[in-house]
A protein has these predicted regions:
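Ligand-binding pockets and gating/stacking loops
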Residues: 1-247
Length: 247
């Protein structure tokens, strides 16, 4: 399992320093004193493990990643290029990557368009186009695109036909996603839908294949094993293979 960071999520509040530097220093000195006493009691090495987590916590709230959330440190022209809403989240994601974050997730809801899809897409579409284009261009200009993989995906596709309410319902057999950067071969469309836009026309590309492609970019062994909740060994990715057109 992984714990992606959502730049617009609740965890952001826990990363902000709520006291001044002097009070933080005083608290840290008190904690060091308590830890010294605890080490005298505990000789089994448990405290050494806790120390590393405490240090990570201090590093998190004091590191330059904090500035990643404050767009006043960004060039106003860049902020304007990204736009509001999703654009602000995309920009914070880029700044987090620059600050050392290895995995950032942005959740952008509002796509469950069972009715009124035309009006909803007229609002949603341009915002996504602007933010995504700005991020890709920005990463490229900063020399970060080759080492950063952008994955844009939903949970599933939508029905090929418009329903009676002017919307589209859930549709699992076919979906569309986009990838950019990460050293993959860009500028192409992979896969094709059948005539009725309901199933893949040629070979299907599965979620496991997508994960295998991401693992390839990250140079992770997709065949690594772990023990599942039933206590049985299983592969991280059971059947997926990297998408050959991209790697």
């Amino acid at each position: 399992a992984y714990g992606p960071f959502d730049p617009a999520g609740e965890a952001r509040r826990n990363m902000a320093l709520a006291v001044d530097q002097q009070r933080l220093s005083n608290r840290r000195a008190m904690l060091d004193g308590i830890d010294t006493l605890r080490r005298d009691i505990d000789r089994k090495g448990l405290m050494e493990g806790l120390d590393s987590f405490e240090q990570q916590a201090f590093n998190l709230i004091l590191s330059r990643s904090q500035q990643a959330f404050d767009l006043k440190f960004e060039d106003p022209r860049v902020v304007d290029r990204y736009g509001k809403g999703l654009g602000e989240q995309m920009l914070m994601a880029r700044r987090l990557c620059e600050a050392g974050a290895g995995f950032v997730t942005i959740n952008y809801g509002g796509w469950d368009m069972h009715s009124g899809i035309k009006q909803a897409m007229d609002q949603r579409g341009p915002e996504v186009d602007r933010a995504v284009a700005a991020l890709i261009e920005d990463l490229d200009q900063r020399g970060m695109l080759e080492n950063t993989l952008l994955v844009i995906s939903g949970e599933f596709g939508r029905t090929p036909k418009i329903n009676g309410s002017g919307g589209r319902d859930h549709w699992a057999p076919l979906s569309t996603l986009a990838l950019a950067g990460g050293g993959l071969r860009m500028g192409q469309v992979v896969g094709e839908s059948a005539e009725k836009v309901d199933v893949p026309k040629t070979r299907p590309i599965t979620p496991q294949d997508l994960l295998a492609t991401i693992f390839h970019v990250l140079d992770f062994d997709r065949r690594v094993q772990f023990t599942n909740q039933s206590g049985r060994p299983t592969y991280m990715i059971e059947n997926g293979r990297p998408i050959e057109e991209l790697v």
